[in-house]
Regions:
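N-terminal helical cap/lid subdomain that shapes the substrate entry/recognition surface
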Residues: 1-57, 68, 72-73, 160
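Asp-based, Mg2+/Mn2+-dependent phosphohydrolase catalytic module
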Residues: 27-32, 49-53, 59-174
């Protein structure tokens, strides 16, 4: 009986490793429900406004995000909407990361070539890998979801890796 439970657990762990996103079918199979995302619990990383202020003096800033409807309002409520020149939200576009189409659309709409853009993200699978595939430079922030991931192959290796958002300033402003 103990051995059967161990095998079942190992099987579940293998399934979830293969299916990193924990899709609805897997959740249903195991009798689980996907928790609703709570936008009221969202917070900014420390010094976000100051960092955006500094970067905005040197760069055009944009967002490519898998977000629920209302992203612009949430950015406005945080007091950071005006720092961004372009916002590409999956809820508005019907495209989502890691689909390279959302990255290509953002580059096209901003008249930016891939080698001129830098993707800063906390997810290897949704941010770093697809941006690298289309030729963008990448910075992986090991903060938030990023703190849980580990680089497993060259495709997942960002051009720069930092521990927190403030660490991007020496890279981008030097």
């Amino acid at each position: 009986n103990r051995r059967r439970r161990q095998r079942a657990r190992a099987s579940r762990e293998r399934d979830f490793r293969k299916n990193k996103k924990g899709d609805l079918e897997a959740l249903s199979f195991y009798g689980l429900e996907r928790p609703a995302w709570r936008t009221d619990l969202e917070t900014l990383y420390p010094q976000t406004k100051e960092i955006l202020e500094q970067l905005g003096q040197e760069y055009k800033l944009g967002i490519i995000a898998n977000q629920l409807p209302g992203l612009e309002q949430r950015l406005k409520d945080f007091g950071i909407l005006d720092y961004f020149d372009a916002i590409f939200s999956s809820a508005d576009l019907g495209l989502a990361k890691p689909d390279p189409a959302i990255f290509r659309l953002a580059l096209q709409k901003t008249n930016c070539l891939p080698h001129q853009a830098i993707m800063i993200g906390d997810r290897l699978d949704n941010d770093i890998v697809p941006a690298k595939r289309i030729g963008m430079k990448t910075i992986w922030i090991k903060q938030g979801f990023g703190s849980l991931a580990q680089v497993k192959n060259l495709e997942e290796r960002a051009d720069w890796t930092v521990e927190k958002l403030t660490d991007v300033l020496p890279i981008l402003l030097s």
